[in-house]
Amino acid sequence: MLLPKDTNAHGTIFGGVILSQIDLAGAVEARRYTDHSVVTVAMNGVEFKRPVYVGDLVSFYTRLVRLGRTSVRVKVEVEAQRSTHGQEIVQVTEAEVVYVAVDAEAQSVSLRPD
């Protein structure tokens, strides 16, 4: 649930807050495919479809799009359950995020040992 501190000048949830949560949710999915840390290298196709309001219950759904040698591409879809409209569930945002596996020196590494 997002709070009033997360709002923009229009009284809806600031897009940057949603992007931050997309990044976190996608990283959890990416980590399923490597024992290394992952870093975000790109956010593609970000689409804010509908606003998110204070009090909405927001859910993030992830799925693998592509597994490369060092990278993982993840689709993240965001839904909001409206607290004021009979618990209506609407898709509010989607994005594809690319993560790269890195070592302790922040150098890209293979997702899995050879």
Where in the sequence are the language-model features?
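Preference for bulky hydrophobic residues occupying beta-strand positions
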Residues: M1, V41, V46, V76-V78, ...
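Hot-dog-fold acyl-thioester-processing enzymes
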Residues: M1-A42, V100-D114
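N-terminal, well-ordered alpha-helical segments
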Residues: S20, D56-F60
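Conserved interaction-surface patches within small, structured recognition/assembly domains
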Residues: V41-P51, S59-V65
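HotDog/MaoC-like acyl-thioester-processing domains
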Residues: Y53-L57, V65-D114
